[in-house]
């Protein structure tokens, strides 16, 4: 009955089945047991056939089957190698010895990464072979990675069918540090007392990671070049290694790790499978453990975005980024014009560290052509400022034989970079509209990269595209609410040509700045910029959407901003007379000497007694900060040529006018402090501690009156 039902079901799917009568196999536990004969399933068509998975001898019983069909195993690992000829001894390079000493003392929690590192090396060897053969138009052999555990012997073996190594390559690759990651690893540890799993996990130490768990490491390798002999490489990590010619070595590389007594758990199949699933599930080649296929092999960037689940994206992100978090944003981008592109990009959830921000780090995006790896980290596929992006780019337009040098200079790569940059910018703009709060958190964490993009990009149109991603608080909006340059421009009154901004550490200081106070009379919206590099960024941007970006400090001294626009409507008895003002300014010029270029009156201020104006103050401030020049007030004044503008209605200025004749000593202390306060408000004083003595003197003078 069951066989008949199966035939009906298969027929309903457009298939026909040829069934043979079951044969009595015998009796088990008093119940009849039947064997199904070999079954063939065929498509309805003259040339299509599909063999079913039911084999002769499979149990069919009235009880639950106790014996499952054995999964077919496939392994290339066998003990065929034998050393022949003489053995040559070599010493490790000094840096390699240091690295081996570090990994030998690594913490237990770090040790599992050796599996990831060796699988990664095997994958690289296969990629190199595939790339070579595809370029030469040759047929590809079976390209696989095999792992084998042996609990009795306490070993774990990894073997690939990749490009293999010659004797010279064994000496060079396994005796010296050639990987930049290993060099960076050593440099990162110079200032650390202990090794860190984060550092080992971040850099990786390639082949040498095997010595974290090994008493002895055997390597058998044979180059894929025709008629190449095989070799054995052997070391216990003590400082020397041996190389000898060996027979029975198949093309590729085989590594046998003899585990330390406290690392025998890595000879357990389940332990190794857990590590592979954690780190190497998306290796681009079939991965076998003790003969069983264990990895997911899908170029998901080639799939339809609708067919990929969030879980698949998370797993793939963790693999390519070697990370443990989830992607904050995911962009699956496919297009056929102007270039053929299949790509997936991820933004990490974790906030970047200072190391991640470093411009020394390259791209973390892999470049493929027709699923053949060109570069693991293609430095030129995205502009430098987008180095926080993780992902994969595949383009059929890229020739497989493109060298690293041509990759840097290729017009095709430049075009690809421009297309991807524009698409990522558009994606971030879309995300900001979709979820403003989530985007604001992203900008808080990654905004430094966008500022860098504006500063380092030469083309103005690209600068302005990146500038659409910037976010600032505004005088026209409540505290905490962010706005963009396009939004600011949309609120501008007709005929307005400038976008105004003010750089300050926080909103309170911005709103109480004398420069913002001077702008309030114009009823003009001002962007508040709080980050260290905002000023430099906007200086480089210069304009946006044909509107000039102007600091409110600069606006005060530009030619079109005439003083007569501000009329003093206060009663005459509340301000100094014109003659008193002229006399006071002359006295102040003399009292301040070379520290000021000029002293003049302003009616822009209300609550502040004075302010300093400098032509292009933002640029001047940045210059002083970067060059660390002009330590004294006189040196700074010589560079800045500041003008001190005083408010004749302010109590301090009116009192100063009286004191300059009645108490000249106190008046000098007061004018020095007014000037210093104005310089601090302008951000032109790095260390205000120098004025503490003067403040104490002023307090003493005040107390003498009481």
From Swiss-Prot:
The modification Phosphothreonine is found at residues 176, 496. The keyword Membrane applies. The keyword Transit peptide applies. It comes from the Eukaryota. It is found in: Mitochondrion; Mitochondrion inner membrane; Mitochondrion matrix. Keywords: Acetylation, ATP-binding, Chaperone, Membrane, Mitochondrion, Mitochondrion inner membrane, Nucleotide-binding, Phosphoprotein, Transit peptide. Pfam families: HATPase_c_3 (PF13589), HSP90 (PF00183). The modification N6-acetyllysine is found at residues 264, 326, 334, 426, 433, 468. Gene3D superfamilies: 3.30.230.80, 3.40.50.11260, Heat shock protein 90, C-terminal domain, Histidine kinase-like ATPase, C-terminal domain. InterPro entries: HATPase_C_sf (IPR036890), HSP90_C (IPR037196), Hsp90_fam (IPR001404), Hsp90_N (IPR020575), Ribosomal_Su5_D2-typ_SF (IPR020568). HAMAP family: HSP90. NCBIfam families: PRK05218.1. Chaperone that expresses an ATPase activity. Involved in maintaining mitochondrial function and polarization, downstream of PINK1 and mitochondrial complex I. Is a negative regulator of mitochondrial respiration able to modulate the balance between oxidative phosphorylation and aerobic glycolysis. The impact of TRAP1 on mitochondrial respiration is probably mediated by modulation of mitochondrial SRC and inhibition of SDHA. Binds to the intracellular domain of tumor necrosis factor type 1 receptor. Binds to RB1. Interacts with SRC. Interacts with SDHA. This is Heat shock protein 75 kDa, mitochondrial. It comes from Mus musculus (Mouse). The lineage of its organism: Eukaryota, Metazoa, Chordata, Craniata, Vertebrata. The gene is Trap1.
